[in-house]
Amino acid sequence: MKNVLRRMSLAALIFGLLLSFSMPESGKAAFWDTKGDNFIHDPSIIKEGNIWYTFGTGLGTGLRVIKSTDGRNWSAAPSIFPTPLSWWKMYVPNHEPHQWAPDISYYNGRYWLYYSVSSFGSNTSAIGLASTDRISSGQWRDDGLVIRSTSGDQFNAIDPDLVVDKDGNPWLSFGSFWSGIKLTRLDKNTMKPTGSLYSIASRPNNGGAVEAPNITYKDGYYYLFVSFDSCCKGVNSTYKIAYGRSTSITGPYYDKSGKNMMNGGGTILDSGNDRWKGPGHQDVLNNSILVRHAYDALDNGVSKLLINDLYWDSQGWPTY
């Protein structure tokens, strides 16, 4: 991943403070004011050439894609797999006609898109994979099943996130409720699991309400971002973003207070505000951009794309 070093002059600092007053909904100069067709749920973002792409949960017409030339003004792009693939019903018989929570990454010269097939409230689920040489081509190869879960499992195979460790090895984190967040190493060629599942976060005393993992590596630490509590209830959503870190990709991950994330630990990064309710299902790009959805209280609770610049304090913890 590419890290961004910021050196802010006094003039830039003053400008930033002035700018912050023009953005009362976020209170931060780092807030990207997204407009246009910015409806999204469970976003994952990437930039190909001069075009930003954000992928999200689809509502019956394939995985949703929106694009932008500046990261602020968004328009719809063609969806992915608008016609259901035949193998989805094999593993998830009660699959509803939409796909959830995609994750887009670039690795070894190819774009990899992991996504979820499930039904609400069930852990009979599957994670699928699609790939392409160029997002702009609109041509995606179906790479099939990655991992599945059934009602007899204590985990839920949804909310995938690809991460590459400091040695260049790909891993997949995933999970939602049940016993929490899992991690497995991937084969560099097939981009599918090679063996063990590691448990890296859970909330045993909070109804299991942890999901949507995202891992990034920076300055000797792996940072695990997760979403706590409940999404999908519009302005009544209680979603919030929490995090911890570890010197090993397989954990243990600890929050700022030293609590293990396997025991419900997690320092809150974003719990929303008067306008933006239930922020979550976050994605971190290049250690410098924080993306998530939130429900707009000024627009009937519609789920929209939120983007902030992401910073790191003197102790190496994320902030925005």
Provide a role label for each language-model segment.
Residues M1-R7:
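Positively charged n-region of N-terminal signal peptides that target proteins for export
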Residues M8-S9, S26:
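Short, intrinsically disordered, low-complexity terminal segments
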Residues F15-G16, E25-G27:
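Cleavable N-terminal signal peptides
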Residues S9-S20:
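Bacterial N-terminal signal peptides
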Residues G27-Y320:
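Carbohydrate-active catalytic/glycan-binding domains of CAZyme proteins
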